[in-house]
Amino acid sequence: MKKILVTGFDPFGGEKINPALEVIKLLPKKIGENEIKILEIPTVYKKSIEKIDKEIESYDPDYILSIGQAGGRTDISIERIAINIDDFRIKDNEGNQPIDEKIYLDGDNAYFSTLPIKAIQSEITKNGIPASISNTAGTFVCNHVFYGVRYLIEKKYKGKKSGFIHIPYLPEQIIGKADTPSMSLDNILKGITIAIEIIFSVENDIKKLGGSIC
């Protein structure tokens, strides 16, 4: 039996809902013999990572998958890399707005996802749901968490694997926002469930085209 911790943020930036939180609430508690535990985290500098750290310590998952909203994206975006910088375009939910600050002074400049990102992307698209590999998780709390969890694993939770997936707005979030893409909660749920199934079943990622020119 393997265990995965799946995190989702609370609403931020004036939104009333966050699709990341909505989708994790709908996840099953098990896939086969493997366990899924969900965790709501605040869209807040430092506190988000601290909450995950406590849960890793108590739950001892094999994998940690964090989900975040990326308004404006057209598909499910499986993130490749997290960078050691906080440069918040907007304030977080407690008014913090660090600019050009390192997340951890003793951390590497960047950490790569240790999840099978291309196998995840391939299987999601095979099921008729748009998905791609993303090479930037931004510089807001999503990247903060992606980097922070990878840092914690490198420093104190050796052997665990983690990564991050961004998802689009839900249709109800784009009312009055002309030409802004969205995805149904059903399709997001299918995509994230597939991602978890692949995380449980694929040890080594596949090799396939997934890069970008710029």
UniProtKB/Swiss-Prot annotation:
Tagged with keyword Signal: no
UniProt entry keywords in alphabetical sequence: Cytoplasm, Hydrolase, Protease, Thiol protease
GO molecular function, one term: pyroglutamyl-peptidase activity
Localization: Cytoplasm
Coiled coil: none
Active site: 79, 142, 166
SUPFAM superfamilies: Pyrrolidone carboxyl peptidase (pyroglutamate aminopeptidase) (SSF53182)
Tagged with keyword Nucleotidyltransferase: no
Biological processes per GO annotation: proteolysis
GO cellular component: cytosol
Family: Belongs to the peptidase C15 family.
Family annotation (HAMAP family): Pyrrolid_peptidase
Cited function: Removes 5-oxoproline from various penultimate amino acid residues except L-proline.
Quaternary organization: Homotetramer.
NCBIfam families (UniProt xref): PRK13197.1, pyro_pdase
Protein name: Pyrrolidone-carboxylate peptidase
Organism: Fusobacterium nucleatum subsp. nucleatum (strain ATCC 25586 / DSM 15643 / BCRC 10681 / CIP 101130 / JCM 8532 / KCTC 2640 / LMG 13131 / VPI 4355)
